[in-house]
Curated annotation (Swiss-Prot):
GO terms for molecular function: DNA binding; zinc ion binding. It comes from Brevibacillus brevis (strain 47 / JCM 6285 / NBRC 100599). The keyword Iron does not apply. InterPro entries: DNA_Rcmb_RecR, Rcmb_RecR, Rcmb_RecR_Znf, TOPRIM_dom, TOPRIM_RecR. This is Recombination protein RecR. Residues 80-175 form the Toprim domain. Pfam families: RecR_C (PF21175), RecR_HhH (PF21176), RecR_ZnF (PF02132), Toprim_4 (PF13662). GO terms for biological process: DNA recombination; DNA repair. Belongs to the RecR family. May play a role in DNA repair. It seems to be involved in an RecBC-independent recombinational process of DNA repair. It may act with RecF and RecO. Keywords: DNA damage, DNA recombination, DNA repair, Metal-binding, Zinc, Zinc-finger. It comes from the Bacteria. The keyword RNA-binding does not apply. A zinc finger (C4-type) spans 57-72.
Length: 198
C-alpha cells in the first residue's frame, strides 16, 4: 500500500525496534500521527535526550546518566557480593525485589556461538578485573535460564574458581527459556534465596 514518504519513513523507523513487524509499525505510526503535536515533540525529545545523555557505568556497565552509576555510588551496599546479569533491564528486575543489596556487573549479552558471540564479545574481562581489584567474596550468576545464559554462567564460573571466590547461580524459580525482565518480584526473590554453588 502506498503511504506518503514521511509515513513510510516513520513505519520503517518503528520496524527497527525488536519485535515490531510491518502491521504493528503501521499502527504505531498512525497513533503518533494522531497525537497532539506537543506530545509528539515530548516523545521525540525524550528519545534524543536518552540517546545523548545515557552511557555505560565505568564500574558495572549498567546504563546511567552519571558515572559511576547511582548503585555503584551507594556505599550502603554490600561490596562483597557481585550479581552478574546479561542486560541493564535485568538490574531493574533484580532491584524491584528489594532483596539484593550487593553490586552488579552487566555483561551486555551472553555467549552464543550460533550468533557469533564469544566470551570476548561481552563484558567478562571487566568482571575479572573487578574481582582482582575489589574484596569480593561471592559472585551470583543471574544470567537468563536458557542455553546461552547457562553456557555463559558455566564459562564465567570456571574463570572465577581460581580467585577462590564463592560462585552461585540463581535458582530456577524462573521458567527455562524465559528472560529476567519478565519475571515478577516474588519469583525473582525465590530465585535469589534458592541460589546454588557452581
Amino acid at each position: 500500500m502506498f503511504y506518503p514518504e514521511p509515513v513510510s519513513k516513520l513505519i520503517d523507523g518503528f520496524m527497527k525496534l525488536p519485535g515490531i513487524g510491518p502491521k504493528t509499525a503501521g499502527r504505531l505510526a498512525f497513533f503518533v500521527l494522531n497525537m497532539k503535536e506537543d506530545d509528539v515533540l515530548d516523545l521525540a525529545k525524550a528519545l534524543v535526550n536518552a540517546k545523548r545523555q545515557l552511557h555505560y557505568c565505568s564500574v558495572c556497565n549498567n546504563i546511567t546518566d552519571l558515572d559511576p552509576c547511582h548503585i555503584c555510588r551507594d556505599k550502603r551496599r554490600d561490596g562483597s557480593i557481585i550479581c552478574v546479569v546479561q542486560e541493564p533491564r535485568d538490574v531493574v528486575a533484580m532491584e524491584k525485589t528489594r532483596e539484593f543489596e550487593g553490586y552488579y556487573h552487566v555483561l551486555h549479552g551472553a555467549i552464543s556461538p550460533m550468533d557469533g558471540i564469544g566470551p570476548e564479545d561481552i563484558r567478562i574481562p571487566d568482571l575479572l578485573k573487578r574481582l582482582g581489584d575489589e574484596q569480593v567474596k561471592e559472585v551470583i550468576l543471574a544470567t537468563n535460564p536458557n542455553i546461552e545464559g547457562e553456557a555463559t554462567a558455566m564459562y564465567i564460573s570456571r574463570l572465577i574458581k581460581p580467585f577462590g571466590i564463592r560462585v552461585t547461580r540463581i535458582a530456577h524459580g524462573l521458567p527455562v527459556g524465559g528472560d529476567l525482565e519478565y519475571a515478577d518480584e516474588v519469583t525473582l526473590t525465590k530465585a535469589l534465596e534458592g541460589r546454588r554453588d557452581l
